[in-house]
């Protein structure tokens, strides 16, 4: 069995001698020899840089949500305006991350389109593994962003539920105003009241009673209007929460439909490829059958000719 010899040192000596013969100084020779030990980091492609940038943005969004989680959910830590500003910042983060992912998807599609040659066939420089790797990177980023968005949807649903609970109408018992007529006072002071005042007093009491009845009716009407306004506000908040949940589910269904469409397109391509291979197999089978028939026919005539010749 032959032995293997390590020629690394001989190679380094040859490189050092070549560098000295070319005219390298000591610093250049040292940097050249150091390159064998410490390799330069490979330069990242634009796609990889954009993917890492998107991942950093998603991580930053997750940290922002974790930092302001209590401020957004707690009822008494922040005001509604501050919660709305937090929600707007998170929405801007999500929109920016989604745009970055769309840019990555468009770059993959452009690369696939440019890699196709004549008649839509793959060119020589087409790398299917690289394309598949990039699709996997985009899928991982999309799932990461979707998980962070789902967490924020849970926080938003909690906030909406708290708003609904606070906006529920609290019915207060209606106070019945009972007016005590000053009978005793009237009776007590009847001796000192003049006859004209005695005749005008029932009229005043009647007017006062009418005013009290109108005031009570207005209070009841205003209370009913307030209850109706609170119910309308509650329904509007519920509709807003339902609209948001519906938009989230519609987005998820759109992603699922797009994924199913891609799978259907891929399945159609596989079926077409299978049909081509099946037709080729049928042609090969028919040609082999013809060859066997011709072979047996020639063999039969050869045997008959040999028998006749002998």
From Swiss-Prot:
Disulfide partners: none
Protein name: Syntaxin-81
Coiled-coil regions listed in the entry: 77-114
Keywords: Coiled coil, Membrane, Protein transport, Transmembrane, Transmembrane helix, Transport
Subunit text: Part of the t-SNARE complex. Interacts with MAG2.
Record family assignment: Belongs to the syntaxin family.
Gene3D superfamilies: 1.20.5.110
CC annotations in GO: membrane
Function recorded in the entry: Vesicle trafficking protein that functions in the secretory pathway.
Pfam families, alphabetized: Syntaxin-18_N (PF10496)
Regions crossing the membrane: 290-310
Source organism (scientific name): Arabidopsis thaliana (Mouse-ear cress)
One GO BP: vesicle-mediated transport
Topology term for the membrane: Single-pass type IV membrane protein
InterPro entries: SNARE, Syntaxin-18_N
Protein origin, superkingdom: Eukaryota
Cell location: Membrane
Membrane is among the record's keywords: yes
Membrane side Cytoplasmic: residue ranges: 1-289
């Amino acid at each position: 069995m032959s032995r293997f010899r390590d020629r690394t040192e001989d190679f380094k000596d040859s490189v050092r001698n070549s560098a000295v013969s070319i005219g390298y100084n000591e610093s250049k020779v040292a940097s050249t020899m150091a390159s064998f030990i410490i390799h330069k980091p490979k330069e990242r492609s634009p796609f990889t840089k954009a993917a890492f940038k998107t991942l950093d943005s998603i991580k930053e969004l997750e940290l922002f949500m974790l930092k302001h989680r209590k401020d957004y959910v707690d009822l008494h830590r922040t005001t509604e305006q501050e919660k709305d500003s937090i929600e707007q910042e998170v929405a801007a983060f999500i929109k920016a991350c989604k745009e970055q992912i769309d840019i990555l998807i468009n770059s993959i599609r452009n690369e696939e389109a440019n890699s196709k040659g004549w008649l839509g066939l793959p060119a020589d420089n087409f790398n299917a593994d690289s394309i598949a790797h990039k699709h996997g990177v985009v899928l991982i980023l999309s799932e990461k962003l979707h998980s962070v968005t789902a967490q924020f949807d849970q926080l938003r649903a909690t906030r909406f539920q708290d708003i609904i609970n606070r906006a529920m109408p609290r019915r207060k018992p209606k106070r019945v105003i009972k007016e005590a007529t000053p009978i005793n006072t009237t009776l007590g002071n009847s001796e000192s009241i003049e006859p004209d005042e005695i005749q005008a007093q029932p009229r005043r009491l009647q007017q006062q009673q009418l005013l009290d009845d109108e005031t009570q009716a207005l209070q009841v009407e205003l209370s009913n209007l307030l209850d109706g306004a609170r119910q309308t506000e509650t329904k509007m908040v519920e509709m807003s929460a339902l609209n948001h949940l519906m938009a989230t589910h519609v987005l998820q269904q759109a992603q699922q439909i797009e994924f199913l469409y891609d799978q259907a397109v891929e399945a159609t391509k596989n079926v077409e490829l299978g049909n081509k291979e099946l037709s080729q197999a049928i042609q090969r089978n028919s040609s082999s059958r013809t060859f066997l028939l011709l072979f047996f026919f020639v063999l039969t005539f050869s045997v008959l000719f040999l028998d006749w010749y002998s």
